[in-house]
């Protein structure tokens, strides 16, 4: 295994290619440990490939989207029927019945009656069209919510794999493998994954932030280790923040 997860109720080992298995009770494997409130994109009891779990969940969501699409079919048929009724309503006309020697008064009465009938039908069809359209849009909204779930799931998986890559990069560097004692991962309110590092040297916590531009951040931190901390003092600050471009922000 590459790492042990002790986050948000998890206690599992993960390999570099994303295979999860439960931590054995009788023994421990000496690998880096990730703690914190971070919630991986799989349940605590899961054993297996994380990618397979994600694909299964995405497939379930696809089925739900397709199921919702089928709910639209009768609404589309009702909408087409309503459109035909509206077209037929526009074609309704009154012709004078010359063969019955219809007078102007009788004709005008029939015209008024037809106008009232058309007005009532127009209101009915417009109301029906609005109700049908609102129901279609409601279902479309549910589909969009499912698609957002898919995007969130993919982003969660992407962050998880970034975390594994990050741990691997620490392990592959002799200096940082010795210096980083603990990695704490958490999810920000915006949904981004950020990490904090507990180093062997000093009494501070390193706010690493998002797992982006990892090499640049480690390079910046290493320069600060060599040029800044020896003169400032290793126990002067409580946090060292390297989340910002070309800056190292220290707080007591």
Label each region the model flagged.
Residues 1-252:
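Charged, solvent-exposed interaction patches on well-folded alpha/beta domains
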């Amino acid at each position: 295994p590459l790492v042990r997860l002790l986050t948000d109720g998890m206690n599992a080992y993960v390999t570099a290619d994303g295979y999860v298995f439960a931590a054995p009770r009788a023994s421990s494997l000496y690998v880096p440990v990730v703690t914190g409130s971070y919630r991986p994109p799989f349940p605590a009891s899961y054993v297996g490939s994380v990618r397979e779990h994600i694909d299964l969940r995405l497939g379930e969501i696809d089925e739900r989207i397709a199921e919702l699409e089928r709910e639209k079919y009768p609404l589309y048929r009702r909408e087409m029927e309503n459109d035909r009724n509206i077209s037929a309503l526009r074609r309704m006309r009154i012709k004078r019945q010359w063969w019955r020697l219809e007078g102007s008064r009788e004709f005008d009465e029939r015209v008024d009656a037809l106008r009232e009938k058309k007005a009532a039908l127009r209101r009915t069809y417009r109301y029906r069209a609005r109700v049908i359209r609102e129901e279609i849009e409601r279902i479309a909204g549910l589909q969009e919510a499912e698609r957002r779930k898919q995007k969130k799931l993919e982003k969660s998986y992407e962050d998880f794999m970034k975390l594994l890559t990050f741990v691997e990069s620490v392990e592959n560097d002799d200096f940082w493998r010795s210096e980083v004692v603990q990695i704490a991962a958490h999810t920000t309110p915006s949904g981004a994954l950020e990490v904090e590092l507990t180093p062997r040297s000093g009494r501070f916590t390193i706010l690493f932030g998002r797992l982006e531009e990892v090499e640049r951040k480690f390079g910046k931190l290493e320069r600060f280790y060599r040029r800044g901390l020896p003169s400032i003092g290793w126990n002067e600050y409580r946090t060292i923040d390297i989340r910002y471009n070309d800056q190292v922000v220290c707080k007591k």
